[in-house]
């Protein structure tokens, strides 16, 4: 069976707190799963590890059959996208700067090509009747526009 995600004994420790404790899961391709649990159960930590935003203290996982320990995991992460809890943005960086940083983290090379694909090669981005400058500081964006910016980052 092909798995989109296989996690084996993932553990994440912050100081004296275990956010994940030998967590394992196998998610077959084509299936739909939901992560449900109490606050502090490790749901966000698991997603942050899979997205490459944090490293597990121990254990391993694979995406599309590619181990997290291999450099090719960057290519596997390009096939997924996530907006986790509070969006991870740099408030002192422009919207464009935030998008470029996300592409750098994912190992994507041609940010300008992506901007052209989504019609953002100019300084302005238009969504419905709302126009805003891409160069606005991210902290000045409304929650809706911030969500749009984050969704563009996972295209």
What residue spans do the PLM features occupy?
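Q-loop/switch helix immediately C-terminal to the Walker
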Residues: 86, 92-107
């Amino acid at each position: 069976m092909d798995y989109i995600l296989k996690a084996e004994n993932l553990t994440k420790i912050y100081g004296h707190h275990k956010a994940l404790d030998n967590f394992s899961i196998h998610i077959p391709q084509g299936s739909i799963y939901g992560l449900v649990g109490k606050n502090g159960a490790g749901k966000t930590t698991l997603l942050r590890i899979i997205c490459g935003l944090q490293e597990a203290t121990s254990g391993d996982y694979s995406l599309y059959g590619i181990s997290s320990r291999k450099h090719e995991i960057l290519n596997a992460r390009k096939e997924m996208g996530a907006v986790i809890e509070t969006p991870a943005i740099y408030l002192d960086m422009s919207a464009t700067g935030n998008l470029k940083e996300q592409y750098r983290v994912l190992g994507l090379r041609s940010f300008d090509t992506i901007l052209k694909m989504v019609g953002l090669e100019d300084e302005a981005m238009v969504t419905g009747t709302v126009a805003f400058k891409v160069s606005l500081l991210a902290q000045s964006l409304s929650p809706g526009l911030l969500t749009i910016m984050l969704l563009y980052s996972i295209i």
